[in-house]
Amino acid sequence: VALFTIQNEFHYEIVRKIFEGGMGIVFEAEQHGARNFVKRVAIKIIRPHFASQKMFIDNFIGEAKLVADLIHTNIVQTYHLGESKGVYFICMELINGVNLEQFTRQLAEKNRQLPKELAVFITSRVCRGLAYAHAKTDREGRPLGIVHRDISFKNIMIAFEGDVKVTDFGIAKARGFLTDQEGEVVAGKADYMSPEQADFQVTDKRSDLFSTGVVLAHLLLGRNIFKGETPEESRRRILNMEIPDFRKLDSRIDTPLNDLLHRCLARDPDQRYATADQLLYDLEYYIYHSGYGPTNETLGKFTR
């Protein structure tokens, strides 16, 4: 019913379902305009059993309003928030590619290993998007205090052209935009969340940097060291597991990269990178300090 309403009132033609997450469903669609104008977009709606719950609706609207002003090459763009007969949807940039979960699964099926430099490159592009979001201010110049809170394989896209995009700010927190229940509920995916999230504490931008470190380690090792049999076990590992010497897990990982990972994954936020810009600098220095390094074209060629 929701899709029928959207198609008829807003000139979208739904092509196929792309992704189904915990709270939302994303479809590929065509937006039609005058004189046979057609633009391929993505349409996100709330899952039906959440669509009547005020908290989910408020967060959905808050996500759209927040991301509408995040204009950055490493963040999926939002074009429009629509509503008809109580049904809300977000029209977004369509990425011709895969998320990291799909990407690494395809590599495993083909028995291919992601080159170390590309793992670091992908992570550096995530950091570029986060650095921009973390520094975002309102129109009066006041910091919004954005924290994504759900940096994970499912929420990082790789376009076949080689662009890396952060998506799904659905549980992000930001001043004045989204419902914030920190200290009451656990937000984020259990095997990527920071110790602060796992322990029901208040988060800041350094929480996203821990999750980014988990992503980098996962890309390098081909597995998530914190993933347990249950979400509860994953949270226990994040809170208590000794962070390994990554050099012993993969011979490609040298001391500088091992040190970088340990700084990202420090349980004490004060021992982590203070900003995404700092982490970005170290990531890019690692892959470019000796000269030429990976580019979007390099990643796109590898992905295709």
Question: Residue ranges of each PLM-predicted region?
Answer:
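Protein kinase glycine-rich loop
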Residues: V15-G22, V26
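AlphaC helix of the eukaryotic protein kinase fold
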Residues: R47-D69
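Activation-segment/catalytic-loop signature of the eukaryotic protein kinase fold
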Residues: L81
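Conserved short submotifs of the Hanks-type protein kinase catalytic core
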Residues: K85-N99, F103
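Protein kinase catalytic-loop region centered on the HRD/HxD motif
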Residues: R128-I146
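C-terminal lobe helix-coil module of Hanks-type protein kinase domains
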Residues: M157, D191-K301
